Every structure is written in structure tokens, then in C-alpha cells.
């Protein structure tokens, strides 16, 4: 089994631990100084509040809040043969590398790791087998230039919340029209899941998938006309831009520490 340590058992760290536990191919140590956070991963990994224990794994995941990164790096002792996978939003690889002899890989994950459906973006000097094994166990990933990491942070890091918002909006409108709220949520959720699966499986452009659903004088084409005449696409773009800007701001805040 691959040995992995996760430093920080908050939302993202816990999701990653749960995903690795679900996969079953990893021996995971979870580190946190918060007893409640450790209790949340009890039974899924080896919980510890001893940083030196967490530092023993070949691959160590840094899953703390950006503002905590400098503190952890000041105490974390790793060797040149180890890999430090940082998932802290806005924290550049060069900053982390300046504080450790370990190989540093930067990843922007998301909470779907818990269910093996994570979308992740990774930046490295060369592919790292330990990191690849982790990412493949909990979802899919793409390799990107680190200059695009703020964009990835907005797209796949913050993106799930934007999708939740859309699911809620569609379910709420169906509920307002008389549908049982639970039924509306099931239908809206499965619709997004099915649509995403269709896009993932298709080689065709998304626009052609839309056209395939839009029969002439049918219901879908009427709804699409409303969307195309609205500012929905622009507003979604603005949401991504705002998240990306905040990611860049976090990098500056960490550099100032």
C-alpha cells in the first residue's frame, strides 16, 4: 500500500482522506492539532497530532489554509527524497519549495475527492508517481502551467459551489411550480450528473450537444432562447474571475508573512 500523510483534516483534507480510504490502496496518516478534526477522520486513517509522525510518509499532502502554510512549513522537516503535495489555494510552488528540500507539487483539487469524482489541476516539474497515484484514486486530473493555477482554482476548486447554486435554482423553480422539493432536488441533481457524463463521453463540441436536445419548436429551444438572451454566461464568467482574483490575492498575502 502507498503511504500518504495529509496535514490538515479540515473539509478538503478530510475529503481526500475519505476518498483514499474508499479506494483502499493507501495507508494514510492524518495530522491536525484540532481534536474535533481528528475525530472526523477516525477509522479512515491513522490520526495524529504529532507533525513528525506525519512527516515520515514518502508523499505528504499540505492541506491547510493558505495563511497557515508558513507556520507549518516552519515546523515541517522533510527530506530530498520525499514529495510535498500542496493544495493550499493561492500558495505558489516556489514559495513552498523555498522552505523544504522535498520535491514540491502543486494541486488544486475539490471536495468530490470523497466520492472518487474529484477534478484536479496539477503543476510540477516532472510527473510524480506518488501524486499521480493519489489523483487517479480520487478522480481525474489535468497538467497545467502554474501561471494558470488561479484560473483552475476558480474553475474546478470553486466551481462545485457554482454548480450547487445552479442545481438549487433549478430545483427551487420546479418546487415553486408545485413539484415536491425532494423530487425536484433528485431530478435537478441527476440532470446535472447525466449531462456531465454525456459531455465527458462525447467528442463533439458542447454546442452540438445542446443543439441535439433542441428540437425545432420544442420546449428546450424555448428555454435556451431565454438563456442566450440573458447575461447568464457573463455572470458565470464574472464569478470565475472573482474567484481567480482572490486566489492571486492569497498568494500575495502569504508572501507578506
Locate the predicted segments by residue.
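Internal alpha-helical scaffold of NAD(P)-dependent oxidoreductase catalytic cores
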Residues: 98-103, 119-152, 163-202, 246
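NAD(P)-dependent Rossmann-like dehydrogenase/reductase catalytic/cofactor-binding core
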Residues: 189-257
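NAD(P)+-binding Rossmann beta1-loop-alpha1 motif at the extreme N-terminus of oxidoreductases
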Residues: 1-49, 55, 99, 117, ...
Amino acid at each position: 500500500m502507498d503511504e500518504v500523510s495529509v496535514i490538515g483534516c479540515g473539509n478538503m483534507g478530510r475529503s481526500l482522506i475519505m476518498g483514499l480510504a474508499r479506494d483502499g490502496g493507501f495507508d494514510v496518516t492524518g495530522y491536525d492539532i484540532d481534536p474535533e478534526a481528528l475525530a472526523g477522520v477516525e477509522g479512515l486513517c491513522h490520526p495524529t497530532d504529532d507533525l513528525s509522525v506525519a512527516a515520515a510518509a514518502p508523499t505528504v499532502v499540505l492541506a491547510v489554509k493558505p495563511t497557515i502554510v508558513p507556520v507549518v512549513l516552519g515546523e515541517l522537516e522533510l527530506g530530498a527524497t520525499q514529495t510535498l503535495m500542496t493544495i493550499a489555494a493561492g500558495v505558489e510552488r516556489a514559495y513552498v519549495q523555498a522552505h523544504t528540500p522535498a520535491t514540491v507539487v502543486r494541486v488544486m483539487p475539490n471536495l468530490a475527492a470523497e466520492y472518487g469524482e474529484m477534478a484536479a489541476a496539477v503543476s510540477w516539474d516532472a510527473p510524480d508517481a506518488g501524486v499521480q497515484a493519489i489523483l487517479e484514486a480520487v478522480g481525474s486530473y489535468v497538467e497545467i502551467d502554474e501561471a494558470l493555477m488561479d484560473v483552475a482554482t476558480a474553475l474546478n476548486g470553486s466551481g462545485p459551489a457554482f454548480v450547487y447554486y445552479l442545481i438549487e435554482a433549478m430545483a427551487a423553480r420546479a418546487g415553486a411550480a408545485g413539484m415536491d422539493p425532494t423530487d425536484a432536488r433528485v431530478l435537478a441533481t441527476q440532470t446535472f450528473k447525466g449531462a456531465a457524463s454525456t459531455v465527458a463521453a462525447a467528442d463533439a463540441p458542447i454546442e452540438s450537444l445542446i443543439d441535439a436536445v433542441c428540437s425545432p419548436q420544442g420546449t428546450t429551444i424555448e428555454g435556451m432562447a431565454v438563456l442566450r438572451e440573458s447575461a447568464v454566461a457573463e455572470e458565470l464568467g464574472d464569478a470565475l474571475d472573482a474567484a481567480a482574483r482572490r486566489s492571486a490575492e492569497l498568494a500575495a498575502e502569504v508572501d507578506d508573512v
